[in-house]
Amino acid sequence: MYDVTEWKHVFKLDPNKDLPDEQLEILCESGTDAVIIGGSDGVTEDNVLRMMSKVRRFLVPCVLEVSAIEAIVPGFDLYFIPSVLNSKNADWIVGMHQKAMKEYGELMSMEEIVAEGYCIANPDCKAAALTEADADLNMDDIVAYARVSELLQLPIFYLEYSGVLGDIEAVKKTKAVLETSTLFYGGGIKDAETAKQYAEHADVIVVGNAVYEDFDRALKTVAAVKGE
């Protein structure tokens, strides 16, 4: 079974966006620790299955980050289920977990399911709107949510700025209070220099939008983070 505490870099692919097969092959063989499939809108069973079938041709771990229960399909190595700690809607805090367990609990191994303590810190992003997150947060708010993740013993605390570069001081202070939760950071990582800078404080760097904006620059983040 895969151990997320050993990861340093992951790519996040949106099943609602197209990526040429040649680029997908390069990405999957880049040395990244995993490929996460997930998005905020337009996520369907069909496009998730299509993306998974392409990624599964390679050895890289393939993860589904669940944002729609109806889009859960078998065949992934891991299933990340986000608990959006700063959501105003209980469905996004624990409701989705209950629904997933009710629908698929008897079919899935508990070793394949990983709960993420999500903290969305960009109030203008699609993820904040989808999850009804109170995302206008200051540094103390973010650190407090990280402490909640520790309290709940969540294996992952995901600090999500979704498309914009977050406050690196917030990342530093968040990391300082986490002892058991692995810190995933996502948002605005578009080049090797920025990836390396944020990797000094986060356990795992998530590169998503950059894959579609400038593939070659996004690819260089792997070596920058992993020191290869």
UniProtKB/Swiss-Prot annotation:
Disruption phenotype: Cells lacking this gene show a cloggy growth and do not produce the dephosphorylated and acetylated derivatives of HepGP. Sn-glycerol 1-phosphate binds at residues 12, 158-163, 188, 208-209. It is an enzyme of class 2 (transferase). InterPro entries: GGGP/HepGP_synthase_I, GGGP/HepGP_synthase_sf, GGGP_HepGP_synthase. GO terms for biological process: glycerophospholipid biosynthetic process. Keywords: Lipid biosynthesis, Lipid metabolism, Magnesium, Metal-binding, Phospholipid biosynthesis, Phospholipid metabolism, Transferase. Mg(2+) binds at residues 14, 40. One of its GO terms (molecular function) is heptaprenylglyceryl phosphate synthase activity. Its cofactor is Mg(2+). It catalyses: sn-glycerol 1-phosphate + all-trans-heptaprenyl diphosphate = 3-heptaprenyl-sn-glycero-1-phosphate + diphosphate. Pathway: Membrane lipid metabolism; glycerophospholipid metabolism. The keyword Metal-binding applies. Its EC number is 2.5.1.n9. SUPFAM superfamilies: FMN-linked oxidoreductases. CDD domains: PcrB_like. Homodimer. Belongs to the GGGP/HepGP synthase family. Group I subfamily. Prenyltransferase that catalyzes in vivo the transfer of the heptaprenyl moiety of heptaprenyl pyrophosphate (HepPP; 35 carbon atoms) to the C3 hydroxyl of sn-glycerol-1-phosphate (G1P), producing heptaprenylglyceryl phosphate (HepGP). This reaction is an ether-bond-formation step in the biosynthesis of archaea-type G1P-based membrane lipids found in Bacillales. To a much lesser extent, is also able to use geranyl diphosphate (GPP; C10) and geranylgeranyl diphosphate (GGPP; C20) as the prenyl donors, but not farnesyl pyrophosphate (FPP; C15). The HepGP product, which is the first archaea-type G1P-based ether lipid being identified within the phylogenetic domain of the bacteria, was found to be subsequently dephosphorylated and acetylated in vivo. However, HepG and its acetylated derivatives represent only a minor fraction of the total lipid in B.subtilis. This is Heptaprenylglyceryl phosphate synthase. It comes from Bacillus subtilis (strain 168). The lineage of its organism: Bacteria, Bacillati, Bacillota, Bacilli, Bacillales.
